[in-house]
Design a protein with these regions (language model features):
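A short, well-structured alpha-helix characteristic of acyl/acetyltransferase catalytic modules
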Residues: 1-47, 174-182
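Short loop/turn microsegments at loop-to-beta-strand junctions
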Residues: 21, 60-61, 151
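Acetyl-CoA-dependent GNAT
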Residues: 41-99, 171-174
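Active-site acidic-Proline motif in GNAT/NAT acetyltransferases
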Residues: 97-99, 103, 132-133
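Conserved acetyl-CoA-binding loop-helix of GNAT-fold acetyltransferases
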Residues: 102-116, 138-143
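Short glycine/proline-centered loop/turn elements that form peptide/ligand docking sites
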Residues: 106, 110, 133-137, 154-159
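Conserved GNAT acetyl-CoA-binding A-motif
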Residues: 119-129
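Conserved catalytic-core motifs of GNAT/GCN5-like acyltransferases
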Residues: 127-130, 147-167, 179
């Protein structure tokens, strides 16, 4: 079913989600592997970001990941920079609740997002960027049939060391082929 599995539901992000997003955005452990800029944000800055960048954009679709049984928000996933003419988008995901890390929620959420992007929006290509030191995410994306397309060498400075940003993407045809094989 679109936007839910046995364990999670994706629902549209609203302004009421700002507080939980603010908590995740200020958790260095959560943002360490996904955000190029680590900082501490005031609630007003997060409110402005949510209203202008997330909710105010006509080129993105942003969803809160809910644990189905408890209805507790556990993360956020989005299609951003949606280009309707060329049928391309970029995807992002953050699992904000650390107690559910490593339990497969990210994989489920990404599958739902890809289903929506490819089977409902009829996108041709979905891309992402991942830090080279985020091995778990790279394995997850490869499991979903994302292919490495390139890398921005030494593009992120984290903990005193330069790291690459890996560019990955999956085409609609590859995604549909993968679905047939399963």
């Amino acid at each position: 079913m679109l936007f839910q599995t046995k364990r999670i539901i994706l629902r549209k992000m609203t302004a009421q989600d700002t507080e939980i997003y603010h908590k995740w955005r200020n958790d260095i452990d959560v943002m360490q592997t996904t955000s190029p800029l680590l900082d501490v944000y005031r609630i007003e800055e997060t409110e402005e970001f949510v209203n202008q960048i997330i909710l105010g954009s006509c080129s993105s679709k942003c969803y809160i990941i809910l644990e189905k049984q408890s209805k507790k928000p556990i993360g956020i996933t989005s299609l951003i920079n949606i280009d309707h003419k060329n049928r391309n988008a970029e995807c992002i995901i953050d699992i904000g609740e650390k107690e559910v890390w490593g339990k497969g929620y990210g994989l489920e959420a990404m599958k739902l997002l890809l289903d929506f992007g490819f089977l409902e929006m009829n996108l041709h290509r979905i891309s992402l960027r991942v830090f080279s030191f985020n091995g778990g995410a790279i394995k997850l994306y490869e499991k979903l049939s994302f292919q490495q397309e390139g890398r921005a060498r030494e593009a992120i400075f984290r903990d005193g060391v330069w790291h690459d940003i890996i560019h990955m993407a999956i085409l609609q045809s590859a995604y549909i082929e993968q679905m047939r094989e399963k």
